Amino acid sequence: MPIRVQDELPAVNFLRNENVFVMTTTRATTQEIRPLKVLILNLMPKKIETENQFLRLLSNSPLQVDIQLLRIDARESRNTPAEHLNNFYCNFDEICDQNFDGLIVTGAPLGLVEFNDVAYWPQIKQVLEWAKDHVTSTLFVCWAVQAALNILYGIPKQTRAEKISGVYEHHILHPHALLTRGFDDSFLAPHSRYADFPAGLIRDYTDLEILAETEEGDAYLFASKDKRIAFVTGHPEYDANTLASEYFRDVEAGLNPEIPHNYFPQNDPQNKPRATWRSHGNLLFANWLNYYVYQITPYDLRHMNPTLE
């Protein structure tokens, strides 16, 4: 949350030069507060597990957040009870005339599927186009990053020959960026993807600012300068055992997967993994909620015109 000081305090300019968020008394006394409305487009098969992961991160904030779950795939789910979907999810036509402070688009196990072969690809494009006028800030995660880069920037699908799976080290590029506020200079985060995100490609074909990279030079965290869209190519929401579940699933399927990198103690799948990215995930989502959503969203969502001033 921002600190509140008198307007004329010399520290105001000093801290703002470091991009520390300072709220003057004038702004604080005129700012109105209400619950934030956040829409989650859940594309993962195990929807309840994914809900738990994202809601855990979103709850770690002093801000009150009202969550709406969205589905766009009308096919019968093999992993989530129909009763759960009917009770807790809405369809797009039920919310398309509403505005939201935030939108999160989750990953999906579609790394080897061409975009046009995705059953709900037209609906994905519809939601992203709608969000331009109805959402203050959208956060894309893993596969959703690849989809958004294609829809919003025309970047073709980039696929790795081998799946990247494990916990990788990253470093921040802009220490004073709001989205990386409080991050360590280097931090760990999980990845589980075929998608490839070369930092050079992002720089050459978009106006997005890369805020953190992997040690191998892949873009991990990047965003638009107006804070309307943000992208995270990994899975900071994952539980300690999620990568293990994926690994053993693929073993049972006879896929001969590589052991996830830097994940099992002593690189032994029989050892219980430990989450080494939990603080990073909590801080990332808290920063997004505060700086990219709360601080720029209009109080009256009927007038969607996000601004920093």
Swiss-Prot record:
The record marks 111 as: Important for acyl-CoA specificity. It catalyses: L-homoserine + succinyl-CoA = O-succinyl-L-homoserine + CoA. The record marks 192 as: Important for substrate specificity. Pfam families: HTS. One of its GO terms (cellular component) is cytoplasm. The keyword Acyltransferase applies. Its main location: cytoplasm. Substrate binds at residues 163, 192, 249. The active site is at 142 (acyl-thioester intermediate), 235 (proton acceptor), 237. One of its GO terms (molecular function) is homoserine O-acetyltransferase activity. Pathway: Amino-acid biosynthesis; L-methionine biosynthesis via de novo pathway; O-succinyl-L-homoserine from L-homoserine: step 1/1. One of its GO terms (biological process) is L-methionine biosynthetic process from homoserine via O-succinyl-L-homoserine and cystathionine. It is an enzyme of class 2 (transferase). Its EC number is 2.3.1.46. It is found in: Cytoplasm. Keywords: Acyltransferase, Amino-acid biosynthesis, Cytoplasm, Methionine biosynthesis, Transferase. It comes from the Bacteria. Belongs to the MetA family. HAMAP family: MetA_acyltransf. Transfers a succinyl group from succinyl-CoA to L-homoserine, forming succinyl-L-homoserine. This is Homoserine O-succinyltransferase. It comes from Klebsiella pneumoniae subsp. pneumoniae (strain ATCC 700721 / MGH 78578).
